Amino acid sequence: MGYNAGSYDVIVIGAGHAGCEAGLAAARMGSKTLMLTINLDMVAFMPCNPSVGGPAKGIVVREIDALGGEMGRNIDKTHIQMRMLNTGKGPAVRALRAQADKFSYQHELKKTIEETPNLTLFQGMVERLIVEDGECKGVITQAGAEYTAKTVVITTGTFLRGEIIMGDLKYSSGPNNQQPSITLSEHLEELGFDLVRFKTGTPPRVNSNTIDYSKTEIQPGDDKPRAFSFETTKFIMDQIPCWLTYTSTETHRLIDENLHRSAMYSGMIKGTGPRYCPSIEDKVVRFNDKPRHQIFLEPEGRNTQEVYVQGLSTSLPEDVQRDMLRTIPGLENVEMMRTGYAIEYDAIVPTQLWPTLETKKIKNLYTAGQINGTSGYEEAAGQGLMAGINAACRSLGKKEVILGREDAYIGVLIDDLVTKGTNEPYRLLTSRAEYRLLLRHDNADLRLTEIGHEIGLIKEERYERFTNKKLQIEQEKERLSSIIIKPRPEVQELIRNIGGSELKDGIRASDLLRRPEMTYEHIHLLVPSEVELSDEVTEQVEIQIKYEGYIEKSLQQVERMKKMESKKIPVDIDYDAISSLASEARQKLKDVRPLSVGQASRISGVNPADISILLVYIEQGKIARVSNQ
């Protein structure tokens, strides 16, 4: 027998990385919010790698922070090591990566949630949604509690009909042997949602005391203070190194001999795995010409001896995992503390979502994270933030927020999901962003802080600091454009010392900075600023001046794209009435129901001829209403 357990503006199902961002965003925007999770001890748990960031993903964390989300602040307080990657490359691909103390990360984020006004955290398993007349009105838990709500966000991760697989062992489970969610998955199918089966995996954990680190290569953090959050002022400098080793020919022989026992190759696993995070079995089979593969030994925290064996994700049986570990240099006498495993789970087909992450089938129902077919904590957190923002906007009667591909990697991620869908766990890569020179690690605040402030997630004090930073950047760029540096002896000497060509005539400081060998520090030595500027300001000045031509070209591409995005397609357009459309294009357009011609042009199977036909149809005003509306 059910009972009325309360009423909320927003209910979030799940408290992983997507759920935490969704719940915090909704509550901070003023919505009365409830977060329901199967196990309170697993809030913000890291079931796989103990790290945050990396290529593209690190930029997402900066974007989350720029919008007012929590992930960046939380990892800044709880990491054991931080490194800037790709420092030898251009600014578009630089990315920050932090090694997390996974237990501190959990505890700190749970504490933040517990102390947030408007936010209630409760342990309970949701089994059904309350749906009336095509609208989600709330949820029903296993215990019979009925919670009503204006909006609901599902962030169930890999728990939906989760199954752990290791060799020929297979059992119903969520990650890390947690209770899975079976009934909710079945209920979503009853509601008419198309589900797919995906798979991911995790490597074994080993005891640090049994590793011979003398046979490995140290991987220290950066000496320079680093942070994901634009608010962080206190930096952790007491860092713990990671270690690099490699598989051996003996490792590969052992894997080859036991491939028939791997769930990946025995037919036990039916779900599709992540292309960019293959198991060690996959790597050995697909790249059999390589004599070895990198293995990173990553501590899981400051107060544990558990070490994550990055690069050794596997579904081999436990006995093979033990033997395999001991074929790796430095791990000859290692003790395994946890076995690696594969996990299969249900995900929804993401083309069933609007760009707001609201489902098309049921109004006021949003989904975010791995349920949408993505992989990774950062991708989940970015979606969770946007779903939480939009659920709150809906509950408060405000306009929802959609980030474009030119605005953020989060925008690229969501657009790819809802427009193209995915047939494997989706991982964000820099190559997926056509405007990546505009979507950099360094300028996330310049791109998104105003949006965060407008929706109420960025406080006035922070916004004031941000506007001051913007002003300083513009003033310094103007100063450098107005100063002429003459070929004085000290100028020529500096230029010679850094391998540049001497000046023949006077040159604007900004033009001199455009030279590849010149940095802002060099210019500052020649024409110092009277105002003390932060590293963040001078970095922006240098990048914006050096890459001005390329940035301008990207902005022109964005303007062309925006013309297509501005051509809106009515939600109730009847594609069957457009007789000239190719049959594949018609079906794809009916499935995705794009909101603009720009979005339609990105759908696989819709070619330029179809877009031309669609444009003519819309511009002539021949919009046929759906007969039952």
From Swiss-Prot:
GO terms for molecular function: flavin adenine dinucleotide binding. NAD(+) binds at residues 273-287. It is found in: Cytoplasm. Its cofactor is FAD. Signal peptide: none annotated. GO terms for cellular component: cytosol. Gene3D superfamilies: FAD/NAD(P)-binding domain (3.50.50.60), GidA associated domain, C-terminal subdomain (1.10.150.570), tRNA uridine 5-carboxymethylaminomethyl modification enzyme MnmG/GidA (1.10.10.1800). PROSITE patterns: GIDA_1, GIDA_2. Pfam families: GIDA, GIDA_C_1st, SAM_GIDA_C. One of its GO terms (biological process) is tRNA methylation. Keywords: Cytoplasm, FAD, Flavoprotein, NAD, tRNA processing. The keyword Transmembrane does not apply. FAD binds at residues 14-19, 126, 181, 370. NAD-binding protein involved in the addition of a carboxymethylaminomethyl (cmnm) group at the wobble position (U34) of certain tRNAs, forming tRNA-cmnm(5)s(2)U34. Homodimer. Heterotetramer of two MnmE and two MnmG subunits. Belongs to the MnmG family. This is tRNA uridine 5-carboxymethylaminomethyl modification enzyme MnmG. It comes from Bacillus cereus (strain ATCC 10987 / NRS 248). The lineage of its organism: Bacteria, Bacillati, Bacillota, Bacilli, Bacillales. The gene is mnmG.
